[in-house]
UniProtKB/Swiss-Prot annotation:
CDD domains: Anticodon_Ia_Cys_like (cd07955), CysRS_core (cd00672). The gene is mshC. The lineage of its organism: Bacteria, Bacillati, Actinomycetota, Actinomycetes, Mycobacteriales. Binds 1 zinc ion per subunit. GO terms for molecular function: ATP binding; cysteine-glucosaminylinositol ligase activity; cysteine-tRNA ligase activity; zinc ion binding. GO terms for cellular component: cytosol. It comes from the Bacteria. Catalyzes the ATP-dependent condensation of GlcN-Ins and L-cysteine to form L-Cys-GlcN-Ins. It comes from Mycolicibacterium paratuberculosis (strain ATCC BAA-968 / K-10). Zn(2+) binds at residues 47, 234, 259. This is L-cysteine:1D-myo-inositol 2-amino-2-deoxy-alpha-D-glucopyranoside ligase.
Length: 415
C-alpha cells in the first residue's frame, strides 16, 4: 500500500542522551534498546487505522507520539524501520459500507487517502512499510497454519468453522497489560471480542480466522475460505516485515487489551519467544466535551475539518504536543488558541537576525524528549529562549536559524 511523502528532517550538530520510554508491561520508564546489534535498524510497529471514517485528533495524537520517537532515533543516528498497518477489512468497515450503500473497498481507499493527506499535513514521518491487512492474507494464513499444527489454535464446530487461538497457549499471556481475568473479560467484550461464542474452549480465546459468511469478503486458505481476525493481522505483518527483535510495539492505550496482548501472544507462540517487543508503548486518549474522542460516541474533532477551517497543521501539532503523550487529555478551542499564539511567537523569534545562544536550549529540548518524550518541558524551554530573544535580543546570528532547525528536526514543527 502506498504511504505518504515524508518531510526532510534537518541534521543538528551533536547528539542528545539515549531515549527512555515508559514500558507498559514493566510499568516503568527505562532505556529503549534500539537495534539488535551494530548497524541494525531501530524497529517499530504501530497499529494503524480501520478506515471507515476520517482522521480525528485521537489518531493524530497517537501517530504524533510515535513520530517523536522516530525523530529522536534519527537525531541519535539510527536507521529506522517503521511499519504501520491498515485494517482494511473488519466488521466496522463492512458495517459502515453497508449502512452508506458503498463498496467496502471504495470506502477504505477513500478514508486511507484522507488519512495520508492528514499525516502529510501534520508532517508525520511516513512508515517504511505501510501494509493493508488485505495485502497480508498469505502471511496470516501461514501463522494460522503454524498455530493449528502446534495445538495453539482450534476449529469451532458448527455452521461456520471459525478458528480460535487458545489464550493459554503461552504461559506469559497477560504480562503486557497486567490485567486480571475479570478486567480482561470486560475489555474483551467491549473491544471486539466474542466471549459468549458457543464452542470456544475459553471465553478469552481470540478469533484467528473467520469462516466465510454470505455477503462478506473472503479469501481462500487450506482451512477454508474466510478472512483474518484482528489481532493476527498485526502479528503477521510485524513478523513478515521486521521479524524477531522488535524494539517497540505501539498504539493508543485503548489497544493494550485485547489487541496488543493477543498480537504479542500470537507472535510469541509462533516464534517460541518470551517477549514479542522489547518495549510496549501506548499513547493516551484525547477527549472533547468531557469524553474520550471516538467514532462510536460521535464527538470527533477531525483533522481535515480543522484544516478546512484554515487552522494551520503546525498549530494542531503544537496543541497536541502541549500535553504529555501518555496522559489522557482534552482538546479545546483554548488549547488551539494557545498553540497558535505559541507558534506565532516562535516564528517571530526565529526570524530575528540574531538571538541568544542556542546551545543550551537545544540540549535541554533533547534532554526532555529523551526522558519519556516530555514535550511540556521541551516546549517550556523553547518558550524561555523565545522570551529572551524577543525581550532582550542577542548577538548570535546563527542562533535563530539553529533553533528553528531543532524545532523542525525534534518536534516536527516547521517555523
Amino acid at each position: 500500500m502506498r504511504s505518504w511523502s515524508s518531510p526532510q528532517v534537518p541534521q543538528l550538530p551533536g547528539r542528545g542522551p539515549e531515549l527512555r520510554l515508559y514500558d507498559t508491561s514493566d510499568r516503568q520508564v527505562r532505556p529503549v534498546a534500539a537495534g539488535a546489534g551494530p548497524g541494525s535498524a531501530a524497529t517499530m510497529y504501530v497499529c494503524g487505522i480501520t478506515p471507515y471514517d476520517a482522521t480525528h485528533l485521537g489518531h493524530a495524537a497517537t501517530y504524533l507520539a510515535f513520530d517523536l520517537i522516530y525523530r529522536q532515533w534519527l537525531d541519535l543516528g539510527h536507521d529506522v524501520h517503521y511499519v504501520q498497518n491498515v485494517t482494511d477489512v473488519d466488521d466496522p468497515l463492512l458495517e459502515r459500507a453497508a449502512r452508506d450503500g458503498v463498496d467496502w473497498r471504495a470506502l477504505a481507499e477513500r478514508e486511507v487517502s484522507l488519512f495520508r493527506e492528514d499525516m502529510a499535513a501534520l508532517r508525520i514521518l511516513a512508515p517504511r512499510d505501510y501494509v493493508g491487512a488485505t495485502e497480508a492474507i498469505a502471511d496470516v494464513v501461514e501463522l494460522v497454519e503454524k498455530m493449528l499444527a502446534s495445538g495453539a489454535a482450534y476449529v469451532v464446530d458448527g455452521e461456520f468453522p471459525d478458528i480460535y487461538y487458545r489464550a493459554d497457549a503461552t504461559l506469559q499471556f497477560g504480562y503486557e497489560s497486567g490485567y486480571d481475568r475479570e478486567t480482561m473479560l470486560r475489555l474483551f467484550a467491549e473491544r471486539g471480542g466474542d466471549p459468549q461464542r458457543p464452542g470456544k474452549t475459553d471465553a478469552l480465546d481470540a478469533l484467528l480466522w473467520r469462516a466465510a459468511r454470505p455477503g462478506e469478503p473472503s479469501w481462500p486458505s487450506p482451512f477454508g475460505n474466510g478472512r483474518p481476525g484482528w489481532h493476527v493481522e498485526c502479528a503477521a505483518i510485524a513478523l513478515s516485515r521486521i521479524g524477531s527483535g522488535l524494539d517497540i510495539q505501539g498504539g493508543g492505550s485503548d489497544l493494550i487489551f485485547p489487541h496488543h496482548e493477543f498480537t504479542a501472544a500470537h507472535a510469541e507462540c509462533v516464534r517460541g519467544e518470551r517477549r514479542f517487543a522489547r518495549h510496549y508503548v501506548h499513547a493516551g486518549m484525547i477527549g472533547w466535551d468531557g469524553h474520550k474522542m471516538s467514532k462510536s460516541r460521535g464527538n470527533l474533532v477531525l483533522v481535515s475539518q480543522l484544516r478546512g477551517r484554515g487552522v494551520e497543521p503546525a498549530a494542531i501539532r503544537l496543541g497536541l504536543l502541549a500535553g504529555h503523550y501518555r496522559g489522557d487529555r482534552y482538546w479545546s478551542d483554548q488549547v488551539l488558541d494557545e498553540a497558535t499564539a505559541r507558534l506565532r511567537r516562535w516564528r517571530t523569534a526565529t526570524a530575528l537576525p540574531a538571538g541568544p545562544d542556542a546551545t543550551d536550549v537545544i540540549a535541554r529540548v533533547r534532554q526532555y524528549l529523551a526522558d519519556d518524550l516530555n514535550t511540556p518541558k521541551a516546549l517550556a524551554a523553547l518558550d524561555g529562549w523565545t522570551t529572551d530573544a524577543l525581550d532582550y535580543g542577542g548577538h548570535d546570528t546563527a542562533a535563530p536559524r539553529l533553533v528553528a532547525s531543532a524545532v523542525d528536526a525534534l518536534l516536527g514543527v516547521a517555523l
